[in-house]
Amino acid sequence: MSELSRRRFLYLSGGAAATAAGVGVWAALLRGESEKGILVPPSTTLGGTSSTTSTTTTAATTTSVPTPPQNPVVVIVQMDGGNDGLNTLVPLDGIYHDARPTLALSDSDLISLTGINDFGLHPALAPLSEFWDKEMLKIVAGSGIPEQGRSHFAATDAWHSARTDKEETGWIGRWLDATEGSTPNPLRGIALGGGASILTGKSSISTVIKSPSNFRLATPPGTDSESIVLAFLNTASPLASEPALAAAQSAIPNSLDAIGVINSAKSEANPDPYAEESFTSLLETAAGLINMNLDTRVIVISVPGFDTHANQLGRHQDLLTDFMTGVSNFWNRIESDGHADRVLLMSTSEFGRRVEENGSSGTDHGAASVQFLIGPGKGLYGNFDLRNLVKGDLPITLDTRSAYATALDWLGGPTDEILGDSYSRLF
């Protein structure tokens, strides 16, 4: 199909149905098409090497390496905007309180972790202590990528690509490329709410749905949806001689399948098709997708709002409450469905916040932050070094690519080749 491949067309069309799909030609029948789903395009470059940062363990960890499960799944939960690590995993340190006279959380309100004397969790994260006691929680304090910067765009690019140069592929996209079978499956990598660039590969296709609750055919009043579907399918053959149109035609059946799959997962998890997109809602959909046994290997969940320059305390409380509710419900669901032993959940955010609060009851862009990994084993890695700040920022004490390497080992594949170097693992 000439140089305008079907895969590339689907990206350029920017359409809504995203199994292998874009189909912008048909977007008039899709509600808010550009916001609902886009294909992650293949890229043209593959990255080189990165520097390593050694792990500093500040608490006893479970040391046994888990046996890789069959059909492993990694769920990446992105706190978009730059989560304030210091008010998430709170140091029991006077320097923290001095730097944040109005934002510092009271030591007495924090959630303690057995065996940890230097930190407490934000009160909204109380259920994480249960994961800790069950040896299912790893915490990375001071996580980041050296030279990631304070720009949302630059830092997000660094976190998604696992590089600080102009790499155009995502680290998960490179894994999808490396493990792609003879029959492409665009549901192996799915992003809900955003996070497209982390799935970008050279050859693999992934699915990105901005809003699962709105990912559906928008039929006019009085119109039979089955008739619309048949009309779509009737236009899929014979293929036109013009490459772009033929590419759109070829995508139609898979596009319709994608709508059915996502809506089935959504309705199975939450009967309200118009529920607000949130960690809770998106993770419910993710649990439904895992239970459908679609050979999905990576699900990326993205929720904005963590750029807390002003009025942080209440907003951050609400965001972490939603995060924790979503994670708890998700884990309860996959345990009930019998999938928990093959799932590793990892939180990310493109950077942390500055140590000192600003004059607007908030915090500005910083450097190091915190990550959580829920799965086998427990431990606290890295540290918040409040006594050796770098231009007012927490220094990065553990490269997040150690967490990435741990996740890639869980999935199976050429971890060091994908990351461009060898990084210490968290198990």
Explain the meaning of each model-derived region.
Residues 2-337, 356, 370-374, 378-427:
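Feature for exported/extracytoplasmic and membrane-associated proteins, marking the mature portion
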Residues 340:
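Conserved H-loop
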Residues 343-351:
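Acidic/histidine-rich, metal-coordinating catalytic segments
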Residues 365-366:
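Conserved active-site-proximal phosphate/metal-binding subdomains
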